[in-house]
Amino acid sequence: MPNIEIKARCNDLKKARATAEKIQTAYLVVLHQVDTYFSTKAGRLKLREINDKSAQLIPYVKGYQLAPMKSDYAIMLVENPTLVKDLFNTLLGIEFVVDKNREVFLFENVRIHLDEVVNLGTFIEFEAVCADNSEQEHRKQETKVANLMKIFN
């Protein structure tokens, strides 16, 4: 499943929250997420534990750059995250763990994440879900993300 995304440091989450409210986003939820990243030869593989209640295995591939980028990913529900984490640690090794509190807003098809990450700081992320994998759709979503970057400064 493709999306267009960008993540950046955000020194003022209060201001970002006010901007999200101003443009009339839908406020979805506050989440506590612990992402365990496993060592891979290509792309990334993470186990995301959400609010100590559910978990997802998320493999993805993206080109890292300082602009909106395409990411191809899949989300697989995990029933036993402890077992999965132990098995993937044995098979691949753990690269790092990211512990964050995330506020999620929705503007049209773009998820806006306001993140407080333990030991790393505060961030904002825009994820525009693509309707298909065409170049035209990618450009359309890149434009949406670029516009939000301007709005949120």
Stretch-by-stretch model annotation:
Residues 1-110, 152:
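N-terminal strand-loop-strand beta-hairpin
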Residues 135-153:
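Mixed-charge, glycine-accented linear interaction segment located at domain edges/termini
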Residues 96-139:
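Conserved, surface-exposed functional patches that form binding/active-site neighborhoods
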